Amino acid sequence: MKILIVVDMQNDFVTGSLGTKEAQAIVENVVCKIKETPAEQIYVTQDTHPEQYLQTKEGLHLPVAHCIEGTNGHCLCPAVEQALKEKQVDAARKIQKPTFGSMELIEKLRSDEKIVADSNLQIELVGLCTGICVLSNAILCKAAFPEADVIVDAAACACVTPASHDTALAAMKLCQIEVEKEGKEPWRN
């Protein structure tokens, strides 16, 4: 079984307060991944912060308000939201996470007997930001499922800068996370 985890494809990371041209360039690849994956094998995370984000530990280190719950920036970008709607992905598979990595995501994966029993399990991650939330969730998946193939599709990920994306991919490879399509990112062209 192959699980797809779509990480934080939210307006604020694509076109909003922390948006980049690299993030905008991967939207189509993320949508393609969603379209080719059965709905029951898709999980989605959303970075979720309170209004007082700037007073949190993260806010002190990254003083840019983003993904504030209830705002447009918190919503998934329209193309991704539409693809998930067309696939009829269950709302229970959408995880609001207040941190970079989601323990709730891991708990949901571990509570599924089919996933736990699968000796050929593959967990693929796509989304934003390669060096923060994709990296954190990929490492959590590798720790929770050490015998699974944890895969990151580099062509469906972007980071704050191309250099930080490359650094994150190198770090994930050290942790035995498979990186596919590195060098084929649409924003490299």
Where are these regions (language model features)?
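Glycine-rich phosphate- or other oxyanion-binding loops that anchor nucleotides, phosphorylated ligands
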Residues: 92-110
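Short, well-ordered secondary-structure micro-motifs
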Residues: 54-56, 105-108, 136-137, 163-164
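Short, small-residue-enriched loops and turns at beta-alpha junctions
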Residues: 102-103, 157-161
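A two-mode feature
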Residues: 127, 137, 177-180
